[in-house]
C-alpha cells in the first residue's frame, strides 16, 4: 500500500473510531461481522469493482443494514461515495487495531529456533501480561536465531535470542579491539 492510501486508511479508521464514541464495543462487533462477511463472500469484490454503480453498491450495504448500526451504515456510505470502497477492508482492519490499542489488547508473535510447547508459550505470555491483554499468540519457527526467542507486538520487539546475544558479543569484542589498537 502506498503512502497516500495508508494515510487515507488511517484517516478513515480514526474517523470511525471517534464517531463510535460510547458505542465502541457494539461497532467493534459489527466491524468484525462485516470483515468476516466480506472475506467469506464475493461481496467485497462487488463493492470494490469500478464498473458497479454507487447506487448498486449502496443497495448491497442496505441489504445487510439490520445487522449494522446507523453510524456504521452512514460511514460505509460515505466511504463508497468517496470512491474508497477498495480500501474498506483495510480501513475496518485498521479500526480494529485502534480499538485493540485503546483497550490495551495485544497480538503477539513468538519466534523461536524450535517448536515451543504450550507450557513454554504460556510462561512467555504470562511474563508479558504487563504489556496488556494478550488476545492472540502466533508462533513461528526460525532456526537462524539459534536459541531463545523473539517476541513481536505492534511495532515493538523483545529479542531474547541467542543470535542477538552473540551479535552483541561480537560488537563488544570489536569495540574492545579498537580501544586496544588506539592505546598502543
Swiss-Prot record:
InterPro entries in UniProt: ATP_synth_OSCP/delta_N_sf, ATPase_OSCP/d_CS, ATPase_OSCP/dsu
GO molecular function: proton-transporting ATP synthase activity, rotational mechanism
Membrane topology: Peripheral membrane protein
Subcellular location: Cell membrane
Alphabetical list of PROSITE patterns matching this protein: ATPASE_DELTA
Described function: F(1)F(0) ATP synthase produces ATP from ADP in the presence of a proton or sodium gradient. F-type ATPases consist of two structural domains, F(1) containing the extramembraneous catalytic core and F(0) containing the membrane proton channel, linked together by a central stalk and a peripheral stalk. During catalysis, ATP synthesis in the catalytic domain of F(1) is coupled via a rotary mechanism of the central stalk subunits to proton translocation.
Similarity remark: Belongs to the ATPase delta chain family.
Protein name in the entry: ATP synthase subunit delta
Provenance organism: Wolbachia pipientis subsp. Culex pipiens (strain wPip)
Gene name, Swiss-Prot/TrEMBL: atpH
